[in-house]
């Protein structure tokens, strides 16, 4: 059975250190319908405040010695903003350990701001919270608006009618943020991903807003449609819903009026009357029909047209609230659990194979549109289509960007702490839930669902991660999602350990691995391997080693020496110290055995990039190859996309936004049309992730030894089918491999255009896996593949020509002048003035291997602020600058 799911400028106040000077400034809000962010905060530890909270909550108190920060930020983010701590210093080596926990863990912090208001007759003021971690007392002008027992939960958003507390002229808002405990509170933590921030994310991490209205207050609009591909195509019925609240003292008759605005200057009016008694709240619906709707598609499948719903509330001809705006897209999500107990998704009627990775927030929960835009550009550049947010829902801007770019989002709550404090959870550390947690969970789910509802990028919400919620919590979550007209999948967890009665099995598997496994693992038929079928909700080989220039930014000379001389040492920039992943012992054992003991940091770094490229490419390729099997793969989430701070694993690009070999392994493995090598079957698979491309294809298969001598040459031909994979033929000549051979697959269409170029380095014998002794994070290897003959490769002479095309593009020509391969050529774009690596940077390909006398051309784009030069190096290619 298929489950069908049917379906928004902040003014800056110029503030001096003397807060009382704010009074003459223009009002923060002054007209009905105006909605503004509290523009900034004065921050101080309660431990360093001599005055009472009560007195500090009145206008005019002197807080000139407090820290001044922006409109949202945790305590640590605010202290960094003020230069109390320096990020470069904090992140270097183990300096993070020196942060004084005593200043944070048991201490509340005060956020204070003054602003001007000019309240008038019949006007009402509402305070909106969206994320205070994890509890707060809220005061306005000496009145406690809410206690920590009400304002509780890092994701719980609330609205407070503060009309009776506002003053004409200066006003003061004071929020006391209580210290967060991940195991006790419904907060947002980092599990074992990295060291915990000393403040545990305490503070006003999302905006606080103030709105002005008449007696009728509106919620943001929600939008549902009856769009069904193949059923309703020429017209779509659309419903706009809003929650209308009479906060006045008498019965009011009024109307909601607005428009649906489309991309082609479409403007359709919508309206509905209402009658509300004092204090009453109703959900009002407005219906209209859109002719020939513009349908929203994931990035590689089509365009991302967006509509806008705009509504206002009127009492007679007087506006009481609005306009409230939300952008939305018209699309159709379906999900089901198939006969193999695997979840399958469809988007607009097409089978949607998830290729994604797990996102991490910044360690101090800092957020910028610029950074998330770059991260999402990298996601698309790698060929991925989905990002998983495990308890890291971030801010509305993230979903706006995903909508515009066509990236699907799987959101949900996090594992291992209080969110999963269930009696049957034998692996987590969270305290058990009590009666007070369920209302917080309800408020959290309502708020997040309201924020996400109109976003077409939402694919699913996971109400559990490693463990499913109990039936009481499940009912609360599902009721809240449905109350907010949820139009995407609701999934009980990311694993198959169990499920709540209401939702049934999740169809997702969480069988690992999380640490290194060889490329051949992914073509196996057990656990997390693709041959076992399924949807891998979080899995990977634990790779993501930054290149040396990045390592030097956060590791000392001794730290870097430890990397290659002490393979079993616990490393501070791995996972948290209590984690299984606190060292690189499993990874290094394989590196030493497969590629040889490193003789320098440079040697270690190069071999690590080889390991990482192999690891990510094989994972994405195996899952793609087996998506058309009888027990199909339906998607995977690589663990992880990006780090919360500078780290040594679980990433596809580093903290400084520099792509690594793991990035380009992914980019190769996730190509929309692709030819891949199955390590287990020694065969070629033809992959098609597009929803429309078809026709004749050819794969040229070449196998050579390390001296460049041909071992086999053949051409395989087949017709490709959209959204399908197919096995072609076995690779010939592998029996002639005496040490290490190179395999090149070149996929072309019927016009001879190259669609994919893919090079493997293959040992004489593959790694031997000990499946029977697998753990939740790793499958041991009893015999490692021998790739050490690569060290015998003769130096290759590679000619490099560059053609700079304007200020943001360059074409690079690489030609191997030698009679043997030029292996694993790295291209690094540097700023001419500083010598620093250019980021963000988008290469068509990188870490490439050239056949004897082969020539290829690669393009690169980058920000126009840089004058660039190119560094070229490789496994057997001398480093040079061009």
Swiss-Prot record:
It is an enzyme of class 3 (hydrolase). Residues 1-21 form the signal peptide. InterPro entries: Beta-gal/glucu_dom_sf, Beta-mannosidase-like_N2, EBDG/EBM, Galactose-bd-like_sf, Glyco_hydro_2_Ig-like, Glycoside_hydrolase_SF, Ig-like_fold, Ig_GlcNase. Glycans are attached at residues 86, 200, 234, 237, 287, 442, 688, 773, 816. Residues 22-31 form a propeptide. One of its GO terms (biological process) is polysaccharide catabolic process. It comes from the Eukaryota. The keyword Cell division does not apply. Its EC number is 3.2.1.165. Transmembrane segments: none annotated. The keyword Hydrolase applies. It is found in: Secreted. Keywords: Carbohydrate metabolism, Chitin degradation, Glycoprotein, Glycosidase, Hydrolase, Polysaccharide degradation, Secreted, Signal. GO terms for cellular component: extracellular region. Pfam families: Glyco_hydro_2, Glyco_hydro_2_N2, Ig_GlcNase, Mannosidase_ig. The active site is at 466 (proton donor), 538 (nucleophile). It catalyses: Hydrolysis of chitosan or chitosan oligosaccharides to remove successive D-glucosamine residues from the non-reducing termini. One of its GO terms (molecular function) is exo-1,4-beta-D-glucosaminidase activity. Monomer. Hydrolyzes chitosan and chitooligosaccharides with retention of anomeric configuration. Belongs to the glycosyl hydrolase 2 family. This is Exo-beta-D-glucosaminidase ARB_07888. It comes from Arthroderma benhamiae (strain ATCC MYA-4681 / CBS 112371) (Trichophyton mentagrophytes).
């Amino acid at each position: 059975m298929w489950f069908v799911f049917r379906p928004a400028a902040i003014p800056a106040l110029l503030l001096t250190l003397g807060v009382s000077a704010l009074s003459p400034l223009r009002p923060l809000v002054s007209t009905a319908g105006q909605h503004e962010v509290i523009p900034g905060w004065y921050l101080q530890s309660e431990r360093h405040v001599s005055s009472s909270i009560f007195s500090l909550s009145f206008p005019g108190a002197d807080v000139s010695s407090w820290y001044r920060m922006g409109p949202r930020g945790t305590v640590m983010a605010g202290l960094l903003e003020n230069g109390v701590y320096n990020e470069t210093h904090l992140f270097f080596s183990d300096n993070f350990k020196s942060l004084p926990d005593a200043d944070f863990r048991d201490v509340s912090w005060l956020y204070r701001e003054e602003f001007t208001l000019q309240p008038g007759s019949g006007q009402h003021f509402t305070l909106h919270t969206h994320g205070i971690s994890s509890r707060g007392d809220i005061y306005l002008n000496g009145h406690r608006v809410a206690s920590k027992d009400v304002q509780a939960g890092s994701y719980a958003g609330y609205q407070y009618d503060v009309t009776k507390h506002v003053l004409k002229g200066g006003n003061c808002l004071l929020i006391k943020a209580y210290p967060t405990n991940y195991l006790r509170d419904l907060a947002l933590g980092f599990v074992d991903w990295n060291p915990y921030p000393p403040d545990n994310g305490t503070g006003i991490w999302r905006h606080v807003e103030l709105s002005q209205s008449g007696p009728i207050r509106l919620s943001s609009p929600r939008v549902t449609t009856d769009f069904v591909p193949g059923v309703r195509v020429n017209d779509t019925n659309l419903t706009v819903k809003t929650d209308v609240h009479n906060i006045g003292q008498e019965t009011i008759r009024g109307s909601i009026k607005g428009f649906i605005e489309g991309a082609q200057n479409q403007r359709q009016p919508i309206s509905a009357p209402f009658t509300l008694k004092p204090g009453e709240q109703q959900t009002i619906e407005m219906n209209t029909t859109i002719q020939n709707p513009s349908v929203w598609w994931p990035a590689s499948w089509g365009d991302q047209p967006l509509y806008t719903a705009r509504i206002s509330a009127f009492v007679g001809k007087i506006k009481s609230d609005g306009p409230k705006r939300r952008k939305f897209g018209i699309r159709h999500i379906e999900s089901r659990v198939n006969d193999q107990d695997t979840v399958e998704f469809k988007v607009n009627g097409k089978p949607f194979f998830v290729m994604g990775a797990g996102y991490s927030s910044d360690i101090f929960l800092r957020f910028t549109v610029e950074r998330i835009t770059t991260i999402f550009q990298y996601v698309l550049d790698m060929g991925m289509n989905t990002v998983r947010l495990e308890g890291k829902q971030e801010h509305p801007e993230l979903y706006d960007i995903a909508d515009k770019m066509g990236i699907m989002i799987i959101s949900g709550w996090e594992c291992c702490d209080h969110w999963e404090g269930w009696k049957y959870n034998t692996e987590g550390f969270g305290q058990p839930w009590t009666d007070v947690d369920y209302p917080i969970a309800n408020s959290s789910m309502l708020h997040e669902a309201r924020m996400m509802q109109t976003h077409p990028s939402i694919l699913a919400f996971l109400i559990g991660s490693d463990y499913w919620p109990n039936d009481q919590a499940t009912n609360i979550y599902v009721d809240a999602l449905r109350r907010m007209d949820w139009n995407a999948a609701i999934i009980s967890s990311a694993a198959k350990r169990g499920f709540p009665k209401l939702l049934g099995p999740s169809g997702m598997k969480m069988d690992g691995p999380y640490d290194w496994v060889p490329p051949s693992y992914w073509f196996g038929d057990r656990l997390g391997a693709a041959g076992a079928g399924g949807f891998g909700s979080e899995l990977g080989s634990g790779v993501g080693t930054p290149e040396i220039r990045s390592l030097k930014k956060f590791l000392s000379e001794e730290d870097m020496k430890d990397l290659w001389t002490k393979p079993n040492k616990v490393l501070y920039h791995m996972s948290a110290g209590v984690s299984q992943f606190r060292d690189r012992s499993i990874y290094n054992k394989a590196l030493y055995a497969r590629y040889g003991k490193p003789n320098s940091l440079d040697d270690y770094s190069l071999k690590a990039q080889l390991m990482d490229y192999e690891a990510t490419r094989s994972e994405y390729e195996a899952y793609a190859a087996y998506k058309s099997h009888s027990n199909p793969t339906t998607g995977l989430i690589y663990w992880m996309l990006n780090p919360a701070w500078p780290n040594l694993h679980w990433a596809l690009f580093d903290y400084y936004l520099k792509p690594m070999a793991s990035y380009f392994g992914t980019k190769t493995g996730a190509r929309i049309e692709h030819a891949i090598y199955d390590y287990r079957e020694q065969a070629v698979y033809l992959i098609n992730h597009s929803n429309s491309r078809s026709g004749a294809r050819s794969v040229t298969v070449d196998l050579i030894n390390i001296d460049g001598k041909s071992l086999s040459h053949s051409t395989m031909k087949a017709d490709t089918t959209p959204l399908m994979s197919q096995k072609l033929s076995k690779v010939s000549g592998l029996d002639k491999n005496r040490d290490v051979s190179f395999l090149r697959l070149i996929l072309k269409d019927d016009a001879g255009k190259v669609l994919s170029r893919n090079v493997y380095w293959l040992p004489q014998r593959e790694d031997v896996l000990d499946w029977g002794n697998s753990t939740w994070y790793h499958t041991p290897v009893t015999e490692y593949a021998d790739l050490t003959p690569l060290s015998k490769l003769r130096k290759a002479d590679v000619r490099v020509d560059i053609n700079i095309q304007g200020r943001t593009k360059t074409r690079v020509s690489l030609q191997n002048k030698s009679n043997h391969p030029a292996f694993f050529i790295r291209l690094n774009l540097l700023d001419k003035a500083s010598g620093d690596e250019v980021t963000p940077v988008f290469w068509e390909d990188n870490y490439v291997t050239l056949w004897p006398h082969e020539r290829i051309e690669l393009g690169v784009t980058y920000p126009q602020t840089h004058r660039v030069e190119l560094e070229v190096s490789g496994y057997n290619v001398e480093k040079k600058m061009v």
